[in-house]
Amino acid sequence: EVRDDVPPGAGKFRGGSGVVKSQRYLTPGFMTHESDRHLDPPWGIFGGKEGAGGKMEIHNIHSGKTRSEYSKFSGMRAEVGDVVSYYSPSGGGYGEPLDRDPAKVLDDVLDGFFGPAHAESDYGVVLKPVDDGYDWALDEEATKILRTKMRA
């Protein structure tokens, strides 16, 4: 599934969303895992912001306990009911976020890549709720004013 716990890196061209892959152990076993960018998130370039780092979590559905693990390990014991979830990093942005077309930022919010607060803080795009708060519309005048302030 698409990773929705963190936004992708902001930029004129935003970074890609990470993904979440999970598997549940039905019997005891051992696992090996290798990934990168847990401590050093993907960089943004030419004014783009960095993406989010990856992470690895193991949640046991019987005990209710969740623990985080390092990005690389081998021969780790897995118990019955362990759900191993790998969150891949999200990509860094390319170019200045304030140069992204506000209509594209609105599309990103409507498509669930990030929320209106992120649109405002990172892209300088002000959205207003419509249809009882279940939809959003671009506030062009407020966006123009905010972006001017953010560029100063």
Language-model region placement:
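Extended hydrophobic-aromatic, low-complexity segments
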Residues: 32-35, 66-70, 93-98, 116-118
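Short, charged beta-turn/beta-strand-edge "cap" motif at the junction between a beta-strand
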Residues: 3, 89-94
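Generic long, charged, amphipathic alpha-helical segments
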Residues: 51-89
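Intrinsic disorder at enzyme termini
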Residues: 98-152
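Long, charge-dense accessory insertions within large macromolecular proteins
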Residues: 1-62
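A short, polar/proline- and glycine-enriched secondary-structure boundary/capping micro-motif
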Residues: 42-47, 96-97, 127-128
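Active-site-proximal structural scaffolding
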Residues: 14-16, 49, 77, 87, ...
